[in-house]
Amino acid sequence: MFGSLRTYIVSSKSISATPAFEALESALGTAKIAGIRCGITSHSPWEDVFQLAQDIQATDADLIITLGGCSITDAVKLAKLFIPNNVSTIPGAEELFARIRADESVKPATIPVINVPTTLSGSEFTCAGGATNLTTGHKQVTMHSSLYADVVVLDPRLSISTPRQVWLATGVRAIDHFVEGLYGNVAALFTDMREELGNEANEDIEKVIAGALGSLLTSLLSTKENWNDEEARLQAFLAVKECPRAGHNGIGASHGIGHQLGPLGVGHGETSCIILPWVLRYNWQHGDETARRRLGLAIDTFWGQEKVAETLGATGLSRKDADLYDVVGAYISALGLPRTLGQFDIKEEQLEGLAESAMKDWCTKVNPVTLTKDKVLDILRNAK
């Protein structure tokens, strides 16, 4: 398809030990494999990204194939952007990000990428990528139109080898994308990007997001009940395809706070498991009528799925009395996923720095209900 002669493969460690990985190597042939990297540290530390960019450039790769989750996808996005812009240091990356924010011209990434996701984080469908400074613990995210994948291959069988908690937790991360996507607070900012995707602004965007959310809620529960259910896995993948529409419509503090939890050892999905319910409660309690209507749509979507409603009812919740915090929290607990910061040994003395980092994150700044550092601290303390 790309006429590639030198393919660079970036794979998760779990996938690299499977027959599928051996089959890929065999299909490409040794002569066409420029290099292989197995594993990227969670939340894509700058050091991993710079090393990856250096390796890809040194091998003169003309195609990159990824097999894995968000950390791998993000690292490749940034690495292929850093190569033409000669970025190899954190100050250089921060300068590049600043130029992108200022809408200044930067050299686009040009190496084509094929993403084969094995989780449900949805990064493979977006042009956003982030990396973490391990010294400061701060994660920075950027967006550029040249960071989209050229091809995304959805293979439900391949995802069966994904660790159970990673699969389920990244599913909650995608739920986070959809629920916060209903906020509608950033739709006006992404008009050009929606047009580029062919996702014109329309009155049906809430219906699209709610439909994808409902499908994901049901299919994710099905995969928990039957780990080898390939049809449910495919439906989960197909639902996650709508993540860009959600992200271009709304986003908020669950993402902003979650970005900063990563450097403390909390996985992508687990950040949403812990923080999303508390952010939703804050937004409901302090939001205006429009915010509550949109959050109400999320509640209706949970209760509108038969399998999900049965699961929620089994916990003692009723549609009449439960708020969105109750509903989302009960769903996450039904998946057997962590709900507190204490489960990751995060201490009280770390919360101040976490709140400061979260307030620097764009997603926190645009939360549909204004947040202060003290309010973020309240959310973090509730989540302990």
Swiss-Prot record:
Pfam families: ADH_Fe_C, Fe-ADH
Cleaved signal peptide residues: none
Alphabetic keyword roster: Iron, NAD, Oxidoreductase
Enzyme superclass (EC): oxidoreductase
Pathway recorded for this protein: Mycotoxin biosynthesis
Annotated EC: 1.14.11.-
Cross-referenced InterPro entries: ADH_Fe/GldA, ADH_Fe_C, Alcohol_dehydrogenase_Fe
GO molecular function: alcohol dehydrogenase (NAD+) activity; metal ion binding
Protein's job: Dehydrogenase; part of the gene cluster that mediates the biosynthesis of the host-selective toxins (HSTs) AAL-toxins, sphinganine-analog mycotoxins responsible for Alternaria stem canker on tomato by the tomato pathotype. ALT1 also selectively transfers methyl groups at the first and the third cycle of chain elongation for AAL toxin.
Remaining remarks: Gene clusters encoding host-selective toxins (HSTs) are localized on conditionally dispensable chromosomes (CDCs), also called supernumerary chromosomes, where they are present in multiple copies. The CDCs are not essential for saprophytic growth but controls host-selective pathogenicity.
Family affiliation: Belongs to the iron-containing alcohol dehydrogenase family.
PANTHER family: ALCOHOL DEHYDROGENASE (PTHR11496), ALCOHOL DEHYDROGENASE, PUTATIVE (AFU_ORTHOLOGUE AFUA_1G06800)-RELATED (PTHR11496:SF107)
Protein name according to UniProt: Dehydrogenase ALT3
Gene this protein is translated from: ALT3
